[in-house]
Amino acid sequence: MKSTAPSYLKHHFLIAMPQMADPNFAQTLIYLIEHGPEGAMGLIVNRPSGLSLADVLEQLRPDEPIPALCQSLPIFAGGPVQTDRGFVLHSAEQQFQATLMLGPLGMSTSQDVLFAIADGQGPQRHFVALGYAGWEAGQLEAELADNTWLSCPADPQILFDLPHDQRLQAAAASLGVDLRLLSTQVGHA
């Protein structure tokens, strides 16, 4: 008898299907940082929070001048869990005080990465979010079985090079899917 080991989706994108009813996740693209038997963790990568890096730096180091470039660096709403906690996905050429290497990317959660970005000494490519999306053991697998999500390998070009409002469709297009043509009604054959 053939054994079937679970397939995990670390370093994949989750693409919300059109019928996604949860407003936290409707029309989202999520980068999966971790996925295993204990659950999953990811960051929504296409939902700006309305804050900029300058707004965050004003809180973290109020006595220092804020570089002008920080006004145009958006902070994204990474998910509904721990929305006051920052996460920085970045190219892997640098490590910081709290960096988890994710293959071609790093994820840092310490303030030093934000200061490095602000000072022009940070990673070449970066994405900053507050909060994350989390799933308990088996929860994401159940949602995938219910056709709530599509998944595809994560593409750093989609994450770093495309405007946020093009990322969801670009990830779907990498699978040959146009989300605008999908029905909001689903079932199982």
UniProtKB/Swiss-Prot annotation:
Native species: Stutzerimonas stutzeri (strain A1501) (Pseudomonas stutzeri)
InterPro entries in UniProt: AlgH-like (IPR003774)
GO CC entries: cytosol
Domain of life: Bacteria
Name assigned to this protein: UPF0301 protein PST_3956
Family: Belongs to the UPF0301 (AlgH) family.
